[in-house]
C-alpha cells in the first residue's frame, strides 16, 4: 500500500473513531434523546441520569449522587442494569478521557497527512506510542459500558465498542508507517554518506613521465578510489588522465 493512501486512510479511520466516541458524551442529561443505558425507568448517560415515566421525563440530574433524596424518589434504589450501585459510576469518567486522547491522535493524524511531519520518524513514533494509550482507553471505555449496562446497553455504547477494532487498526498502521518511514530515512542517509565517501576517498597518483618526439612532456596520473580497509576490494576502474607541457 502506498504511503499516501496509508496516511489518508489513517486520518479517515481516526475521524470515525472521534465521531463514535463523541456520541456517549452527548447522552442524558445533556441530550434526552441519547441514552447510554436504560433500566427500571432510569435513562443513564456518562454525566448523569434521567427518570422517565410513560415517555415523560420527570427528573434529570447531572452526576450520580447516591446520597441525594431525589435519587430514591421514584424507586427504592438507583441501580445500574448490572445491579451495581451508583458508587461505581466513577468508572464512566474514562469516556471523556478516552475521547480527549482520541482527539489528540486525530490531530496527529491530520498533521501526518497534511504536513512534512508525515515523513519525520520521531513524530510518527510519538503518534504510534500515543495511539497505544488511546486504544487502551477506548477498550476500557467499552468494557466499563458492558460491565455496567450489560444487555441494556444502547447504540451509543455499541459505537464505542465498534471504535475499539478501528483504533487497533490505526495503531497497527501507525507502527507500520513508522517502520517504512524509518527505513526510507536511513536508506537515504546511507546513500548520502556513501556518495560523499566515494568522492572523499579519491586519490590522484603520479605514475610516469614520458618525452615525445617533439620534446613535449607527457605526465600520467591515475585517479583511483582509496579503500577504507585492507579487506575492501576496489571494484571501480581507475581513470587515467594525461597532461602535456612544452
From Swiss-Prot:
Keywords carried by this UniProt record: Cell membrane, Membrane, Transmembrane, Transmembrane helix
Q: Where does this one sit in the cell?
A: Cell membrane
Which regions face the Extracellular side of the membrane? Answer: 30-91, 151-154
The processes (GO biological process) annotated in the record are:
ascospore formation
Q: Give the UniProt entry's GO cellular component terms.
A: cell division site; fungal-type vacuole lumen; growing cell tip; plasma membrane
Q: What biological function has been recorded for the protein in this entry?
A: Required for the proteolytic cleavage of the transcription factor RIM101 in response to alkaline ambient pH.
This protein is called pH-response regulator protein palI/RIM9
Q: What is the lineage of its organism?
A: Eukaryota, Fungi, Dikarya, Ascomycota, Saccharomycotina
